[in-house]
UniProtKB/Swiss-Prot annotation:
Top-rank taxon, per record: Eukaryota
Gene3D superfamilies given in the database record: Glycerol uptake facilitator protein
Protein's organism: Zea mays
Topology term for the membrane: Multi-pass membrane protein
Localisation: Vacuole membrane
Protein name per Swiss-Prot or TrEMBL: Aquaporin TIP1-1
Motif (NPA 2): 198-200
Length: 250
């Protein structure tokens, strides 16, 4: 069971060169993702005068985030695993695929990457505000369920295409599959709660603009969804027992 495989690791791991390189890769990947995702929304808003709230703006956001995440996961995959998301890291932790200390190091890197991306966007766009997440036409509990379900789908996709040792050649399309599910989920939930699925994505803009409304939804929902996906996939679909190969007569 995953609970038996959860590892705390050692605090010394935080200072290990390999862990630090992986964390820096997470920082860069998250910066790339948030800069492109948030920046596309800011550019669309400037061009259309509030356009991100329109159907065209929603489609543009979905496409931009899908492409940006595809790239961000790809460039980090061989170094850190390309999590780019605290919920993905948490899902990997509860599934026994990353230690607690390395996971916390990833979290710090991801939050810093998002924050730096938002500060860079504000500086390089003449002080234009970054987009923050909020609820439109749904209650806080409905938004929480949305975030749980959408993030479950995201982390389940990560497990199926990137974590599962049986993935084989499917692993080569993992980044694009992960980008696609995020883009599709933005089309589903973007009009209701912004479709974060990623605490880092909502944290950076909130910190830079100092607007913390409903921020807990964008932490609790993704962490529950990511954790459930990690536990379920590990329990049901990943075998950790040795299976003897059938004997063959020569």
């Amino acid at each position: 069971m995953p609970i038996n495989r959860i590892a705390l690791g050692s605090h010394q791991e935080v200072y290990h060169p390999g862990a630090l390189k992986a964390a820096f890769a997470e920082f860069i990947s998250t910066l790339i993702f948030v800069f492109a995702g948030q920046g596309s929304g800011m550019a669309f808003s400037k061009l259309t005068g509030g356009g991100p709230t329109t159907p065209a703006g929603l489609i543009a956001a979905a496409v931009a985030h899908a492409f940006a995440l595809f790239v961000a996961v790809s460039v980090g995959a061989n170094i850190s695993g390309g999590h780019v998301n605290p919920a993905v890291t948490f899902g990997a932790f509860v599934g026994g695929n990353i230690t607690l200390f390395r996971g916390l190091l990833y979290w710090v890197a991801q939050l810093l990457g998002s924050t730096v991306a938002c500060f860079l966007l504000r500086f390089s766009t003449g002080g234009q505000a970054t987009g923050t997440f909020g609820l439109t036409g749904v209650s806080v509990w409905e938004a929480l369920v949305l975030e749980i379900v959408m993030t479950f789908g995201l982390v389940y996709t990560v497990y199926a295409t990137a974590v599962d040792p049986k993935k084989g050649s499917l692993g080569t399309i993992a980044p694009i599959a992960i980008g696609f599910i995020v883009g599709a989920n933005i089309l589903v939930g973007g009009a209701f709660d912004g479709a974060s699925m990623n605490p880092a994505v909502s944290f950076g803009p909130a910190l830079v603009s100092w607007e913390w409304g409903y921020q807990w939804v964008y932490w609790v929902g993704p962490l529950i969804g990511g954790g459930l996906a990690g536990v379920i996939y590990e329990l049901l679909f990943i075998s950790h027992t040795h299976e003897q190969l059938p004997s063959t007569d020569y």
